[in-house]
Amino acid sequence: MLRKQDPMKTAGWKKLSDHFQTMKDVHMRDLFAEDGDRFQRFSIRFGDILVDYSKNRLNQETLLLLLGLAEEVGLKDGVEAMFTGERINETEDRAVLHTALRNRSDAPVFVDGRDVMPEVNAVLKKMEEFSRRVISGRWKGYSGKPVRDIVNIGIGGSDLGPKMVAECLRPYAAKGLSVHFVSNVDGTHIVETLKLLDPETTLFMIASKTFTTQETMTNAHTARDWFLKHAGDPAHIARHFVALSTNTDRVKAFGIDPENMFVFWDWVGGRYSLWSAIGLSVACAIGFEGFLDLLQGAHEMDRHFREEPFERNIPVILALIGIWYNNFFGAESEAVLPYDQYMHRFPAYFQQGNMESNGKSADRGGGRVRHQTGPIIWGEPGTNGQHAFYQLIHQGTKLVPADFLAPALSHNDVGDHHAILLSNFFAQTEALMRGKNREEVIEELRREGRSEDAIQRLWPHKVFEGNKPTNSILFRKLTPRVLGSLIAMYEHKIFVQGVIWNIFSFDQWGVELGKQLAARILPELNDRTTVAAHDSSTNGLINAYKQMRG
């Protein structure tokens, strides 16, 4: 099990607090000037991925102290506890083994003394057979036509993960097959999607472990009603709906053939489920070989994380850097900035991954934490963000550590687009690190021929303090294998931070209260009586809503 230890009471935390006093005003310009080998010293290569963390407000002593904290809180034991199937998700009494889903070795993985790999591989085999039938056109709809559109209906991890991967790997998409994703219970989402579809050639994948998720099942029933309006016979549902679930009775009641039900297990958390049967839409979108490459890339990062010494361990290093800013510099958010349009959903995916995992205020012993935990995660693809929020990162009053991600090779190498894109990628991290001081600004304005009055008026607005931290993650090309490694890298970073912060990263009780209250409010919306059972604001809003609807 994971240790229950307040990190603020450790010797390592005290040493870092003292060290922060010597580092808080050190400028990265000086760190680079003092160390010509800083890039080599603070970067790590992993296959086709290069992680450069040299543009951070740290030195070798900082890194050693952070590594010491990781050792002191028992991180190594925590990593082994996860990989060996201990029930580290204590509040739900579950193991955490999404790593088993992408275990491409012959090694067994045990939960409660039972090797789960035969079941994992059996589901993978079933996914392979099904995806090949769909892609080849051998899976026919009720009218004998092959599938041309797949609609994944899910929410949270059952939507964000597959959608992000399908978008990232669109260059590998199977020809003649389009994949759509519906998640929001707002009827607009399903209605606008259905407008694009032909019921004779559409396959729906209903992704809900229990087959009771309100948003998912509401959308699923709307999709079924639309389908039956055209197809007529409920027997045709079996050719156009499959289930990613564990509830056989509810799947059958919906009209889906249990043979077309793809199972997963309670040791797979929703936000880590894209590696499971929840990834069936991905296997159909990019082909099963591509899905296996995705798993392989993640497995390789799993091995790196489990086996590599912490000082050369990418997820550990990234996690420790995040703790340095979150808990000592007081940074409240982190930006994820991919310079690849295919990765436009990558920040949103890890917004969920990070904030749902580490957005906790109770420690593992049941007390309230005394330190900051999970950061706010946000971002947009470059160069869009440069013309939106980079102003704040460069010259605002908030410290926003940022990860910049980019491929050396584009899937669409047209003209000089990619060179321009990457020139911005390199320029932004340099500008954020170096900045531009008063003397440089004044000299630049003088070269422009500005008057001394104009110079004195303008220079304060054109100064860039710099010293803004970034990690640069450069990879050769966005392939399924590389993407798998990148996703696993961030997953493990999140886990490491949760271990150090003494919180449980694999539950999500914060989503429950709103659902409970919504279940109570829903029947109140369907009658004409004045509502008075809530606080005055909620009562007023509900009654205004009912009045507006007539």
Curated annotation (Swiss-Prot):
Q: Does the keyword Cytoplasm apply?
A: yes
One GO MF term on file is: carbohydrate derivative binding
Q: Which domain of life is it from?
A: Bacteria
- Cytoplasm as a keyword of this entry, yes or no, is yes
- The principal location of this protein is cytoplasm
Compartment list: Cytoplasm
Q: Name one GO cellular component term.
A: cytosol
What does UniProt list as catalytic?
A: 356, 387, 515
Q: Which reaction does it catalyse?
A: alpha-D-glucose 6-phosphate = beta-D-fructose 6-phosphate
Instruction: Tell me which Gene Ontology terms the entry assigns under biological process.
Output: gluconeogenesis; glucose 6-phosphate metabolic process; glycolytic process
InterPro entries recorded for this chain? G6P_Isomerase (IPR001672), G6P_Isomerase_C (IPR023096), Phosphoglucose_isomerase_CS (IPR018189), SIS_dom_sf (IPR046348), SIS_PGI_1 (IPR035476), SIS_PGI_2 (IPR035482)
Q: Which CDD domains match?
A: SIS_PGI_1, SIS_PGI_2
Q: Which UniProt keywords apply?
A: Cytoplasm, Gluconeogenesis, Glycolysis, Isomerase
Say what the protein does. Answer: Catalyzes the reversible isomerization of glucose-6-phosphate to fructose-6-phosphate.
What this protein is called in its record is Glucose-6-phosphate isomerase
Gene source species: Syntrophobacter fumaroxidans (strain DSM 10017 / MPOB)
Q: Which gene encodes it?
A: pgi
